[in-house]
A protein has these predicted regions:
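Extracellular-facing segments of soluble proteins and assemblies that are Gly/Ser/Thr-biased and enriched
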Residues: 12-120
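N-terminal segment immediately downstream of the Sec signal-peptide cleavage site
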Residues: 1-17, 173, 180-182
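Beta-strand-connecting loops/turns
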Residues: 35, 150-151
Length: 182
């Protein structure tokens, strides 16, 4: 599915819709079936073993090999620390009703995983060929919303993140979904 201002959830897994995140403000319109929960990504960071990290002997510059659990821990610690110091605010509303205590919904991948990315993706530099990263971990804040009642709904969510080295540099992810439940 192409990404653009009007595309909606990218994946239906079982009965759950997984919505597309963004690092810039975006507005989307989607239709879902009655009874389908929605999975929202407030903030997510992926730590992965990129080809640029590898030397000629299959070792990361940090000294770990692809199969080392220590490498997964190293990546996990790095993204966890980055999220800790950079995530300033989280917010989510459903039909103008704020959802509270969002920082309690943090989760991370307990096991490393391989990650495939398509050509033209952010990971691929926008227009390069896609590929697979043999080891990745993730850390962030996620919400699983109970199925919404039939009708029209507005779900707004996102985060404000800051650069701890220069607080004048910050980004705000504002996602606005207009959802029709059939």
């Amino acid at each position: 599915m192409p990404l653009g201002p009007t595309c909606g959830p990218v994946l239906l897994l079982g009965s759950t819709w997984f919505t597309v995140g963004s690092t810039t403000p975006v507005e989307r319109w989607v239709t879902v079936e009655r009874g389908q929960p929605l999975f929202l990504v407030l903030v997510s960071m992926i730590g992965c073993l990129a080809d640029a990290c590898m030397d000629g002997e299959g070792k990361c510059q940090a000294g770990y090999g692809v199969g080392d659990e220590a490498l997964a821990d190293y990546l996990r610690d790095g993204i966890r620390t980055c999220n800790d110091v950079s995530t300033a605010e989280l917010y989510a509303t459903v039909d103008s009703h704020p959802l509270g205590n969002l920082f309690q919904y943090r989760a991370w991948s307990p096991q490393p995983f391989a990650w495939w990315y398509p050509a033209g993706s952010i990971v691929a530099g926008g227009d390069e060929a896609g590929g697979e990263l043999p080891l990745a971990v993730t850390d962030g804040w996620y919400l699983l919303l109970a199925p919404l009642s039939p009708g029209e709904h507005v779900v707004r969510y996102g985060a404000k993140c800051v650069n701890p080295d220069d607080p004048s540099i910050w980004c705000t992810a504002i996602l606005l979904y207009h959802i029709t439940v059939k």
